[in-house]
Swiss-Prot record:
PANTHER family linked: V-TYPE PROTON ATPASE SUBUNIT B
Species this chain originates from: Caenorhabditis elegans
One Pfam family this sequence matches: ATP-synt_ab_N
Cited function: Non-catalytic subunit of the V1 complex of vacuolar(H+)-ATPase (V-ATPase), a multisubunit enzyme composed of a peripheral complex (V1) that hydrolyzes ATP and a membrane integral complex (V0) that translocates protons. V-ATPase is responsible for acidifying and maintaining the pH of intracellular compartments and in some cell types, is targeted to the plasma membrane, where it is responsible for acidifying the extracellular environment. Essential for the proper assembly and activity of V-ATPase. Required maternally for early embryogenesis and zygotically during morphogenesis.
The protein's name: V-type proton ATPase subunit B 1
Family the entry assigns: Belongs to the ATPase alpha/beta chains family.
InterPro entries to which the protein is assigned, alphabetical: ATP-synt_VA_C, ATPase_a/bsu_AS, ATPase_F1/V1/A1_a/bsu_N, ATPase_F1/V1/A1_a/bsu_nucl-bd, ATPase_V1-cplx_bsu, P-loop_NTPase, V-ATPase_su_B/beta
Any one biological process term the GO annotation gives: positive regulation of programmed cell death
This protein's encoding gene: vha-12
CDD domains: ATP-synt_V_A-type_beta_C, ATP-synt_V_A-type_beta_N, V_A-ATPase_B
Assembly and interaction partners: V-ATPase is a heteromultimeric enzyme made up of two complexes: the ATP-hydrolytic V1 complex and the proton translocation V0 complex. The V1 complex consists of three catalytic AB heterodimers that form a heterohexamer, three peripheral stalks each consisting of EG heterodimers, one central rotor including subunits D and F, and the regulatory subunits C and H. The proton translocation complex V0 consists of the proton transport subunit a, a ring of proteolipid subunits c9c'', rotary subunit d, subunits e and f, and the accessory subunits vah-19/Ac45 and vah-20/PRR.
NCBIfam families: PRK04196.1 (NF003235), V-ATPase_V1_B (TIGR01040)
Molecular function in Gene Ontology: ATP binding; proton-transporting ATPase activity, rotational mechanism
C-alpha cells in the first residue's frame, strides 16, 4: 500500500495562495517604444493576444500589471492599471502571460476590504481562492433568465410605494454633487429585505452586499465602512475601494472585479447579492481618458462612441438565472454633472437600466430627506413585484393616484406663483394642501426610520382622504369601499 502524504492538502492550499494573480510568463520583452498617458506601446511582439495580461517590471524593481488593448502587426498597446509614471523605455521589462485577467473568488471575501484591483488592503491574509474567474463574467443565456418578481422592501416610502424594486433588478440613483445619495444607498443596504406578509412566516434570507467605490474620497469610503460596521452587516459585505488618489485606469476593472465576486456569491454560494457601485461618473471619465489616449474619434462631450456598450457590459450583469437560487440586484450611483439629466452618462444609463431613482436638489434645499423626486423616478419592473399575494391589492391604484395628485399639485403650485392664491379654486387648494402634506408626511422620514410597505400605503391613504371620494378617479370603487373609510387601511 502506497504511503499517503498527510501534508498534501496543506501544500495544495499554500500553492493556491502563492499563485493568487500570477500566471507563468510566456515571453519577456524590453521593447517599449512609447508611453502615452495610461498606455505603453511595445514593438516586435510575437503573437500578442487581445485582452492578454502583461506583467511590467520597472527599473526600480516594482511590479505593475496591464492589459493588451490593441494589436497591429507586431505592435501592442498595453493599458497599465497602476499608471505609467516611472516607466523607462530602455530598462522596463514586460512579460506577456498568455492569460486574461482573472480574479480569485471565495466565500471568505465577505467581511474583507480590497483595493480597486482586488488585492486585500485590510492587513489580512490573501484570499484562499476557490476559483479564478474571468473578470468579464460569463454571458447569461437570455432564455435562462427569470423575470424578477419578489419585491425588496427598502423601508423608504418614496421607493416602496412609488418605485418598487424587484429582486434581480438594476436601478440607478441619479444624483448630483452635494446630495445625500450615499446616505440613501446606505439606508437601502441597512433596511433592505423581502416584504414580510402578515400570513406568512418570517423568512431569514441568505443576504450579501458587494460594494465597489470608484474615484470616491476617503470620507465616502469611511462613511460606508463605518455604516456597515455599526449595523452589524460588515461580515456580509465585500468592499472594493478605488479612492480618488488611486490610479484612474484601475477604475475600469474595479466594477468588473466586484461583479465577478457577486456572480460567484450569487450563483455558486446561493446568496442574494445587492451590488452598490459608486460613482459611475468617475468610471465613465476613466473610460474617456483611455479613449483620448488611444486617439479614438470622440462622441458626445468627448466620451467614446462605445460607452453605451461598455456600460451595458456592467449593468447587464444583474438578474436571476433558472436553476440557481441566488440573485444579483444592482444599485449604481451616478452624479449628474451640473445636475444635467441629458448628460451622456445618465442618458445612456437610463436606456440600459430598469428605471431610476432621482435625487432632487430643490427638495434637499428645503431640508427634505430623502430628497427623492417621485415624478422623474421610475421602476420598470414594479408592476410584476406588487399586488395581491406580493404586497397588497391596492398598491398599484394608490401609487397611480398619489402620482396623479402630486403632479396636479405641482402644476397648481406653478399657477399660484403667477395668479396668486386668491384666484385658485377650492379643488386647487385641496391639491396644494395634498402637495405640502405629501412632501412632509410621505416623502420625509428619518435616516433610521424603517417603514413597512403596509405602513407606507396607510400613510398614502391618509393623504388621499384630503380629497372627496369622487375626486379619486384612478382607484376602483371596490378598493375605495374597503380602504377609503377612516381606519379601513389598518384593518
Amino acid at each position: 500500500m502506497a504511503a499517503v502524504d498527510v501534508n498534501q492538502p496543506i501544500t495544495g492550499h499554500k500553492s493556491a495562495i502563492i499563485r493568487n494573480y500570477n500566471t507563468n510568463p510566456r515571453l519577456i520583452y524590453q521593447t517599449v517604444c512609447g508611453v502615452n498617458g495610461p498606455l505603453v506601446i511595445l514593438n516586435d511582439v510575437k503573437f500578442p493576444q487581445f485582452s492578454e495580461i502583461v506583467k511590467i517590471t520597472l527599473p526600480d524593481g516594482s511590479k505593475r500589471s496591464g492589459q493588451v488593448l490593441e494589436i497591429s502587426k507586431n505592435k501592442a498597446v498595453v493599458q497599465v492599471f497602476e499608471g505609467t509614471s516611472g516607466i523607462d523605455a530602455k530598462n522596463t521589462i514586460c512579460e506577456f502571460t498568455g492569460d486574461i485577467l482573472r480574479t480569485p473568488v471565495s466565500e471568505d471575501m465577505l467581511g474583507r476590504i480590497f483595493n480597486g484591483s482586488g488585492k486585500p488592503i485590510d492587513k489580512g491574509p490573501p484570499v484562499l481562492a476557490e476559483d479564478f474567474l474571468d473578470i468579464n463574467g460569463q454571458p447569461i443565456n437570455p432564455w435562462s433568465r427569470i423575470y424578477p418578481e419578489e419585491m425588496i422592501q427598502t423601508g423608504i416610502s418614496a421607493i416602496d410605494v412609488m418605485n418598487s424594486i424587484a429582486r434581480g433588478q438594476k436601478i440607478p440613483i441619479f444624483s448630483a454633487s452635494g446630495l445625500p445619495h450615499n446616505e440613501i444607498a446606505a439606508q437601502i443596504v441597512r433596511q433592505g429585505g423581502l416584504v414580510q406578509l402578515p400570513d406568512r412566516p418570517h423568512e431569514q434570507t441568505n443576504f450579501a452586499i458587494v460594494f465597489a467605490a470608484m474615484g470616491v474620497n476617503m470620507e465616502t469610503a469611511r462613511f460606508f465602512k463605518q455604516d456597515f460596521e455599526e449595523n452589524g452587516s460588515m461580515e456580509n459585505v465585500c468592499l472594493f475601494l478605488n479612492l480618488a488618489n488611486d490610479p484612474t485606469i484601475e477604475r475600469i476593472i474595479t466594477p468588473r472585479i466586484a461583479l465577478t465576486s457577486a456572480e460567484f456569491l450569487a450563483y455558486q454560494c446561493k446568496k442574494h447579492v445587492l451590488v452598490v457601485l459608486t460613482d459611475m461618473s468617475s468610471y465613465a471619465e476613466a473610460l474617456r481618458e483611455v479613449s483620448a489616449a488611444r486617439e479614438e474619434v470622440p462622441g458626445r462631450r468627448g466620451f467614446p462612441g462605445y460607452m453605451y456598450t461598455d456600460l451595458a457590459t456592467i449593468y447587464e450583469r444583474a438578474g436571476r438565472v433558472e436553476g440557481r437560487d441566488g440573485s444579483i440586484t444592482q444599485i449604481p450611483i451616478l452624479t449628474m454633472p451640473n445636475d444635467d439629466i441629458t448628460h451622456p452618462i445618465p442618458d445612456l444609463t437610463g436606456y440600459i437600466t430598469e428605471g431610476q431613482i432621482y435625487v432632487d436638489r430643490q427638495l434637499h434645499n428645503r431640508l427634505i430627506y430623502p430628497p427623492i423626486n417621485v415624478l422623474p423616478s421610475l421602476s420598470r419592473l414594479m408592476k410584476s413585484a406588487i399586488g395581491e399575494g406580493m404586497t397588497r391589492e391596492d398598491h398599484s391604484d394608490v401609487s397611480n393616484q398619489l402620482y396623479a395628485c402630486y403632479a396636479i399639485g405641482k402644476d397648481v403650485q406653478a399657477m399660484k406663483a403667477v395668479v396668486g392664491e386668491e384666484a385658485l379654486s377650492s379643488d386647487d387648494l385641496l391639491y396644494l394642501e395634498f402637495l405640502t402634506k405629501f412632501e412632509k408626511n410621505f416623502i420625509t422620514q428619518g435616516h433610521y426610520e424603517n417603514r413597512s410597505v403596509f405602513e407606507s400605503l396607510d400613510i398614502g391613504w391618509q393623504l388621499l382622504r384630503i380629497f372627496p371620494r369622487e375626486m379619486l378617479k384612478r382607484i376602483p370603487e371596490s378598493t375605495l369601499e374597503k380602504y377609503y373609510p377612516r381606519g379601513g387601511a389598518k384593518e
